[in-house]
A protein has these predicted regions:
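Hydrophobic ligand-binding cavity/cleft-lining segments
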Residues: 31
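Strongly charged
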Residues: 2-10, 14, 25-26, 34-95
């Protein structure tokens, strides 16, 4: 895997959107995450799908729609303050 890419399940866990990597993998495997890269939108259906800084993700979590832009991949699952530096919130798309 390239240095500038990371698996979606690992990144969701590092960014603290999921408590465990297994839950992050389940979110991806169920097709509940949308990825926008270079203007092309696709549904993520595998936990092994790679993401890069600049990609945008949209997913439902905790009954809320979450839209973010990936700013960094991170090296570890750090404290919440460190996790918040991995992404920038976006306005969710209109339903």
């Amino acid at each position: 895997m390239a240095e500038d890419a990371c698996r979606i399940d690992v990144w969701l866990w590092r960014a603290r959107f999921c408590k465990t990597r297994s839950l992050a993998a389940k979110l991806a495997d169920e097709g509940r995450v949308r990825l926008t890269r270079g203007g092309a939108e696709s549904r993520i259906d595998k936990a092994s799908r790679t993401i890069r800084p600049g990609d945008e993700l949209v997913f439902a979590l905790g009954g809320r729609l979450t839209a973010i832009r990936i700013e960094a991949l991170g090296e570890r699952r750090g404290p919440p303050a460190e996790a918040r530096t991995l992404y920038a919130p976006l306005d969710p798309p209109a339903a």
